[in-house]
């Protein structure tokens, strides 16, 4: 199983939020130290989120993201505040491997199609963040009327092949992922690569995702709190 340890950036620090609530910040750490720790542990993929950027609707933590990129050879995917081709160009130029478009996929789907035409489907993913069955946007501060299934279908028709799916109710709660939601989406779109995000708290959760047909997952609070030891995660990844 492909695993993406997560580093969420707020005011230049690595933090964890509970259910995406900016008022529920915990585990403030040095993101450079965390990135090095993950690299030293042998992880080949990192998931970065610019939380300030998601809220401001533009890139904010570019400096620290650049330093992380310079420090590690790992595959890095990045989301948060990426709403223009110019922003994508900047991040891809500094060596970010894949960009995650979230809110813009709802508000400006043509942008996603343009990005794929320009940069390739392997460099652009779409983040689908759901709350009570509807897609949330703008750093999860707004909820649209679009369902996850509808957005996934629409984006796949525009050339998207990789999706990061988060059930906000599960995020940061350490109570397990919404395996049923993920399984339903994967079964509906078997050609899509769906990366699970939110709620993973144990190796058993990862096995449940595998049983659901999901072959990649983002690990946030579980690795940062030590609920799952990095050595055990690496063993799970193989």
From Swiss-Prot:
**Would you say which domain of life the source belongs to?**
Bacteria
Q: Where in the cell is it found?
A: Cytoplasm
Its BP terms in the Gene Ontology are:
L-histidine biosynthetic process; L-tryptophan biosynthetic process
* Statement: the UniProt record of this protein carries the keyword Nucleus: no
Q: Where is the active site?
A: 8 (proton acceptor), 129 (proton donor)
Q: Does the keyword Transcription apply?
A: no
> Keywords in UniProt for this one?
Amino-acid biosynthesis, Cytoplasm, Histidine biosynthesis, Isomerase
Q: InterPro entries per the record?
A: Aldolase_TIM, His_biosynth, HisA_bact_arch, Isoase_HisA-like, Isoase_HisA-like_bact, RibuloseP-bd_barrel
SUPFAM superfamilies named in the record: Ribulose-phoshate binding barrel (SSF51366)
Indicate where this protein is primarily found: cytoplasm
Family affiliation = Belongs to the HisA/HisF family.
Protein name, UniProt field: 1-(5-phosphoribosyl)-5-[(5-phosphoribosylamino)methylideneamino] imidazole-4-carboxamide isomerase
User: Which organism does this sequence originate in?
Assistant: Lacticaseibacillus casei (strain BL23)
């Amino acid at each position: 199983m492909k695993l993406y340890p997560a580093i969420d950036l707020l005011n230049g620090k690595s933090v964890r939020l509970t259910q995406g609530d900016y008022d529920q910040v915990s585990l403030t750490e040095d993101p450079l130290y965390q990135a090095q720790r993950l690299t030293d542990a042998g992880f080949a993929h990192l998931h970065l989120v610019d939380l300030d950027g998601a809220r401001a609707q533009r890139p904010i933590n570019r400096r620290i993201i650049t330093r992380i990129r310079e420090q590690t050879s790992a595959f890095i995917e990045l989301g948060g505040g990426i709403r223009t081709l110019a922003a994508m160009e900047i991040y891809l130029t500094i060596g970010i491997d894949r960009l995650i478009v979230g809110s813009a996929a709802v508000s400006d789907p043509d942008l996603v199609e343009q990005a794929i035409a320009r940069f390739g489907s392997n460099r652009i993913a779409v983040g689908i963040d759901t709350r009570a069955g509807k897609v949330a946007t703008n750093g999860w501060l707004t909820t649209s009327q679009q369902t996850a299934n509808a957005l996934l279908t629409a984006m796949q028709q525009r050339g998207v092949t990789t999706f990061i799916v988060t059930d906000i109710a599960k995020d940061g709660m350490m109570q397990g992922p919404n395996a049923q939601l993920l399984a339903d989406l994967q079964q509906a779109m078997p050609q899509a690569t769906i990366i699970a995000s939110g709620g993973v708290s144990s190796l058993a959760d990862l096995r449940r995702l595998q049983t659901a047909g999901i072959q990649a997952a983002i690990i946030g609070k579980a690795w940062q709190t030590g609920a799952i030891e990095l050595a055990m995660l690496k063993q799970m990844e193989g």
